[in-house]
Amino acid sequence: MTTETEKRALEDDTVESKRIKYDKGIAPIKPEFIVENPSVPADDRYVNDDDAEAGDRNGEEKGKKKKRGQNKKRDMRQQHEEVRLCSSLLDPSNPGTCRFGPEHCRSTHDVTTYLAAKAPDIDGVCPVFKSIGYCPAGLKCRWLNSHYEDGKLKRDQSQIDAYASSGQGEVNKISTEAKLALQKKKYLFEVSDNVIKYLDSQVQSDENIAKREEAKENNASYVEAPFKIAEKKKLDLRGAKIVSPLTTVGNLPYRRLMKTLGADVTYSEMALSLPLLQATNSEWALPKAHSSEYPGFGVQIATSKHWAAAKAAEVIYKETTHVSELNLNCGCPIDLLYRQGQGSALMEQPARLLRILKGMNASSGDIPVTVKIRTGTKDNKNTAKSLVERVLAENDVAAITLHGRSRQQRYTKDADWEYIKEVGAVVTEWNNKKEEDKESSETNRTNFVGNGDVFTHEDWYNAVNTEGVDSVMVARGALIKPWIFEEVEAQQYLDKSATERLDILRKFADFSLEHWGSDEYGVGLSRRFMCEFLSFTHRYIPVGILERLPPKINQRPPQWRGRNELETLLGSTDYKDWIKITEMFYGKTGDNFTFIPKHKSNAYESG
């Protein structure tokens, strides 16, 4: 006969056996979706946000080669067609002029030979032709049969007119004249030249002041700036849905996609000031934006010199038309930039940072200047608070963004939102003083934006409701889950089906072909950037297979299977599956396609 005590013990054992134990840092996936004896080690399956911030600018560390870790020296080149057609013959019915002449041109002028050697067309209608009514790639298009008939390229005039009237297209393209002037060092920097002279004198003055001890002498050495800063456009980021500047993955098609998914503010990939001033084509491709991004598009630059910052600010102001803010990167943690005194290294040189901001502010016309920083450069030594106090006192910045991690910490720990709150209080106090001061009350308030670990609508609202925080900048969360701002708007979790997620990728594919082109080279480039995108999106775990909410961005899952084959495919960590997904939009990979991801555990070379 079982006693009452024994019954209770049996009940306790039953409850204990049903209770699921969760390991810290492991995503709580329902048991029926967990794969037993996984083929892929958990260690190799996850990357961190450095990949988004560093992109392809990271430096290779000296020492022994490792089989794991980042592929920092990645070859990004994509091969062209074996038989190339001269660009003057893209439209044979309306040929252009070849500057080399048919006899000296390295590309063929024989259309028949080119078409015979060209790879088979991809099935379906050309996404670019469907969108804008014609295809700029002409005969080189991989979907040529959809808009080529009887030896002529088709044009849908009604679609061309509709696209033109919509005002869509890419903006912020530098003119050929300006580019040549920069390359020949004949560009007129009418504003920044005067600003630089003043800042140079301030550097000398600072060195002299450091040698003096009496405050009166210091005050006497102050020289009024010989220029007036232009009135800036108003920048109000309160409650704005902001996508962080992201290198490589933060390209134009991705940002355009995010605008369709609810983003209010986007930023260019980080551009280096010196290559901008040298008119490097690859660098000037970065400030380009889609018209849908403006207003709300910011250009981010990195620099270590005040003269380069001032000149870059002036040329961006003069040569672009759709820029809402100019952002200085003082948060990038990668070694290459840090060793050059750029990115987060500026936090260790406050005087230099302040000069750079002054130069940008004075040279950027009506474009407001903003800055992105970290808590500091070293663990357990936060310096952002004192730095922000100096920035507010000595510069009129429109916004300060604080990433709640140090450079040294990277992503080993959660973002420090308590410290973000502390710094936010400093900015709030400053704004309140400005409102009370009649002389400065007419100047725009300084926005304060937090950044770090926002992955759900709950994270977003918790952050925005933090005292002193105007809005939140989302980085990894917007890469892993591009519809995060739809969740913010709905204030609930959205369990997107695999088909819906595939539609998001399809939209990215269409945007990428419009941007990079539908020829062989453009398709290869688009495929590569979709693979980069998938290196983040595959990390999303559908909320419908989780035991409990909320999901955390730093949680690592055991290997899992989806609710259908497509969901499993979209969550695959295998690079071969990423390639398979791209083939749904860009056709089969050719022998000339290569993809080397950031992590050495995944690499692909066709053939």
Swiss-Prot record:
List of catalytic residues: C332 (proton donor)
Location (main, coarse): cytoplasm
The protein's Enzyme Commission number: 1.3.1.89, 1.3.1.-
Domain of life: Eukaryota
SUPFAM superfamilies linked: FMN-linked oxidoreductases
Zinc finger (C3H1-type): 81-112, 125-150
Basic and acidic residues bias: start-end ranges: 42-63, 72-84
UniProt region (Disordered), positions on chain: 27-88
Chemical reaction(s) catalysed: 5,6-dihydrouridine(47) in tRNA + NAD(+) = uridine(47) in tRNA + NADH + H(+); 5,6-dihydrouridine(47) in tRNA + NADP(+) = uridine(47) in tRNA + NADPH + H(+); a 5,6-dihydrouridine in mRNA + NAD(+) = a uridine in mRNA + NADH + H(+); a 5,6-dihydrouridine in mRNA + NADP(+) = a uridine in mRNA + NADPH + H(+)
GO molecular function: flavin adenine dinucleotide binding; mRNA dihydrouridine synthase activity; RNA binding; tRNA-dihydrouridine47 synthase activity; zinc ion binding
Names of the cofactor(s): FMN
GO cellular component: cytoplasm; nuclear periphery
Compartment annotation: Cytoplasm; Nucleus
Residues spanning the membrane: none
Residues noted as binding FMN in the record, renumbered to the chain: P245, L246, T247, Q300, K372, H403, N451, G452, D453, A475, R476
PROSITE patterns per UniProt: UPF0034, ZF_C3H1
Top-rank EC class of the record's enzyme: oxidoreductase
InterPro entries: Aldolase_TIM, DUS-like_FMN-bd, tRNA_hU_synthase_CS, Znf_CCCH
Keywords: Cytoplasm, Flavoprotein, FMN, Metal-binding, mRNA processing, NAD, NADP, Nucleus, Oxidoreductase, Repeat, tRNA processing, Zinc, Zinc-finger
Gene Ontology terms: biological process: mRNA processing
Family named by the database record: Belongs to the Dus family. Dus3 subfamily.
Function: Catalyzes the synthesis of dihydrouridine, a modified base found in the D-loop of most tRNAs. Specifically modifies U47 in cytoplasmic tRNAs. Catalyzes the synthesis of dihydrouridine in some mRNAs, thereby affecting their translation.
Protein's recorded name: tRNA-dihydrouridine(47) synthase [NAD(P)(+)]
Species this protein is from: Meyerozyma guilliermondii (strain ATCC 6260 / CBS 566 / DSM 6381 / JCM 1539 / NBRC 10279 / NRRL Y-324) (Yeast)
Gene: DUS3
